[in-house]
Amino acid sequence: ISKAGITGKETVLDMGCGTGSLAVALAAMGCSVIAADFSKGMLDRLHSKAAERGMLLEGGTSGFGSDIFPAGDFETCPSEVQAGKILPFRMSWEDDWANYGLGKGSVDVAVASRSVITHDLEDSLKKLSAVARERACVTVCTGVSPRVDARVARAMGLELERHNDALFVFGIVSDLGYEPTVSYIHSPRTKSYISPDEAYYSLLRTRDYLADTADQISVEESACRLRSFLADHLVEIEEDGAKRWTLDQPRVVPWAFISWDVGI
């Protein structure tokens, strides 16, 4: 939020809002939040979370919570969301956003945090830029997949695939005539397990995540290497009064935060 330069007075589109972690934080600051996602399950959880906090603004797409979300049937226009409230509705990157009340310059800031999952990246970035009056921002993967612990993968003898999402976004935004800026977020993640066996079988899935390059080493060899790695790096901890196991170092996931002023 701080990287996006949001102060709490803006109208913000949270595109690909998921369960609403960002949307709720923005509303708590006083922002007027339009939260859109293609997933009914995610929106149901956001709906409950926002309602519990008194942040929910009713009047999103007709039939909210059902399997049918017709466009253009709003009781509340997205541009009229009150401060500190969240208007959730179901909308995908591929939809015509104007049918949902999101025309040119509808919001101050348009954000897509770790959610630019689309077949046409350029079209999606154009849409995000078009609805913003001041600024558009995205957070995208840089380096290896967020699902993969690079240290574990290397220990298993697996070749890491680096993602170029940040380079693609930067290039497209530049080609669209904007001046993108980039900064980085390094997010530490830890996970605990109820037993060493659970840790082993959970981390063994690293091979599945890197399936395109996994044939360079046998399943048996990578599994043996993982066992050896865990013998050296799996440590016992106490969590909520119970014995658990975790790796001795957190996994750090790098993200690229890319923003650009649209100057409407």
What are these regions (language model features)?
Residues T19-D96:
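Class I SAM-dependent methyltransferase SAM/SAH-binding core
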Residues C141-L160:
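Short, glycine-/aromatic-enriched active-site segment of Class I SAM-dependent methyltransferases
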Residues K9-G18:
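Conserved class I S-adenosyl-L-methionine
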Residues R133-G143:
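Conserved beta-strand signature within the Rossmann-like core of class I S-adenosyl-L-methionine
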